[in-house]
Amino acid sequence: MVWGQQVEQFKLWPDKPEAGEAEIFVYHPAKGGKAAPAVLICPGGGYRGLAMNHEGHDMAKWYASNGFVAVVLKYRMPEGVHTIPLSDAEKAMSVIRGNAAKWNLDANKVGVIGSSAGGHLAASLSTLAADANRPDFAILYYPVISFDNMTTHGGSKKNLLGKDIENKELVDRYSLQKQVDDKTPKTLLLLSDDDQTVPPLNSILYYTALNEHHIPASLYMFPSGGHGWGFR
């Protein structure tokens, strides 16, 4: 399929060589006109790698073809420093809003999309980020939400927390259903009931927390589909 979007690639931290892996890919909608909404896309990969195609670039092409400025985030792996992925996501949100005029986007309509562990990062951005870097809406595909051992995806938890995996304070901090507050954005959750990788309870817990805080939320659980379907 021919999409016809213009794509730009940028270093996220151009003045920090040690953070050179972090990049964003900006897909512009084919048609100009009024300022467009935007989405920051966080691929999954268990905080060990990144599914850049079906949970990144393929998504961006679709969203851009539907009128969004779509930004794929190639975030760094934690490698023992649990703050790294969220710092990259916050920086990306700042860059997007800071380029609103240049990229012809509406700085008040910047959402986040995340899949699996990328959904955990997107939900972290929605609940833990500084106010100025929080998204205006979130779309989470089969996200990791809780770090409770009975609910979580063990690989994502291990790779993010590393040696601090038994630190109760950090486990609670990254159990994001516990971090929802009145500033958490409206959220759409999409998942499969037969997901054997990330238990559907993760999304249910987050949806329940959003509902308790009277934040608009929708959850769509398909009867089959498994995990990691992205835009395949």
Regions found by a protein language model. Give the residues of each.
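Short beta-strand element of the alpha/beta-hydrolase
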Residues: A35-G45
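Catalytic nucleophile-loop/oxyanion-hole region of alpha/beta-hydrolase
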Residues: A51-A60, V71-A107, R232
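Active-site nucleophile elbow and catalytic-triad environment of alpha/beta-hydrolase enzymes
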Residues: A22, D164-Q179, T184-P185
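Short beta-strand/loop motif that positions the catalytic acidic residue
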Residues: K183, L188-L191, D195
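C-terminal catalytic histidine-bearing segment of alpha/beta-hydrolase fold enzymes
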Residues: F25-Y27, I204-R232
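N-terminal cap/lid segment of alpha/beta-hydrolase-fold proteins
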Residues: G4-P37, H82, T152, D181
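Conserved alpha/beta-hydrolase "acid-adjacent" motif
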Residues: Q196-L205
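Primarily recognizes the serine-hydrolase "nucleophile elbow" in alpha/beta-hydrolase
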Residues: K91-S156, V171-D172, L176
